[in-house]
Amino acid sequence: MANAYKQAGVDIEAGYEAVSRMKKHVQTTMRKEVLGGLGGFGGMFDLSKFALEEPVLVSGTDGVGTKLMLAFMADKHDTIGIDAVAMCVNDIVVQGAEPLFFLDYIACGKAEPSKIENIVKGISEGCRQAGCALIGGETAEMPGMYSTEEYDLAGFTVGIVDKKKIVTGEKIEAGHVLIGLASSGIHSNGYSLVRKVLLEDGELSLDRIYGRLELPLGEELLKPTKIYVKPILELLKKYEVYGMAHITGGGFIENIPRMLPEEIGAEIELGSWEIQPIFSLLQEVGKLEEKEMFNIFNMGIGMVVAVKEEDAKDVVRLLEEQGETARIIGRTVQGAGVTFNGGTAL
């Protein structure tokens, strides 16, 4: 049967076109250590030039979750790849690792070349922001598994750090200062609740501006996750950082303790940073309790670093010079868990 595979729903020619269109974006991410080009069976990266005493590779993998459904609804696909990169590289930089390379996995119902190109364009932008090379990936056309408009997106990154410079959090003591780096918005966690609260129950429109939002709701919800790699690596060159937490699913309450020793807790000062209007809208429309908000969302802080009190102001200044909005948001205390001072934040 001629064109049997195409009749089964897999268009090989469209796949070839998608690869051809993405190459110019991938090329912008290349580093001198990358060996070979796009299209090989495996991506190669030369580690021989890294002058580290005890080099340690650090890996991370993640996806974008149901934020993808907002991209489908808005038919906007050129930034969701930034989210995929951010979720991976932010996870490994908290251990002090410099991201080296990234690989993506796209599974779709129909490999529409322009859509795949836009997804990879976003992935490439994320890689440039993180300073890592996009050295490979897989686009799997899977009719029957996904509708023609649907796709899933995941990624994998590898970074490197000298063993003696790994940031573990084990030396954090009571009295260390916690500095928060502002998020761009919701980032990539909690979107199942976001959709239920705002779109299903609240029946809000993606095209309208609500409350104190500055953008239509759809644009606000699709703001890409902030990538903190470059400012954090710059910080690590100049100051001792005792611990870091990427504030993802589980919010403050689950993620900050991940960097703390068992006997140390965190005391957060509400009102010490600006919480974006999207979180107020979510709480108001969904009638959500403040504690629940802090247990699900980043609440305006995407990364937390722990430093000595005498370094705190200088660290804030350095991060601000790197283009970040940084605030002292609390300190570590004897005890366990996360407590909040200062009343209502929203």
Swiss-Prot record:
Its EC number is 6.3.3.1. Its main location: cytoplasm. Keywords: ATP-binding, Cytoplasm, Ligase, Nucleotide-binding, Purine biosynthesis. Disulfide bonds: none annotated. One of its GO terms (biological process) is adenine biosynthetic process. It is found in: Cytoplasm. One of its GO terms (cellular component) is cytosol. GO terms for molecular function: ATP binding; phosphoribosylamine-glycine ligase activity; phosphoribosylformylglycinamidine cyclo-ligase activity. Pathway: Purine metabolism; IMP biosynthesis via de novo pathway; 5-amino-1-(5-phospho-D-ribosyl)imidazole from N(2)-formyl-N(1)-(5-phospho-D-ribosyl)glycinamide: step 2/2. It holds the Pfam family AIRS. It catalyses: 2-formamido-N(1)-(5-O-phospho-beta-D-ribosyl)acetamidine + ATP = 5-amino-1-(5-phospho-beta-D-ribosyl)imidazole + ADP + phosphate + H(+). The keyword Methyltransferase does not apply. Signal peptide: none annotated. SUPFAM superfamilies: PurM C-terminal domain-like, PurM N-terminal domain-like. Belongs to the AIR synthase family. NCBIfam families: purM. PANTHER family: TRIFUNCTIONAL PURINE BIOSYNTHETIC PROTEIN ADENOSINE-3 (PTHR10520:SF12), TRIFUNCTIONAL PURINE BIOSYNTHETIC PROTEIN ADENOSINE-3-RELATED (PTHR10520). This is Phosphoribosylformylglycinamidine cyclo-ligase. It comes from Bacillus cereus (strain Q1). The gene is purM.
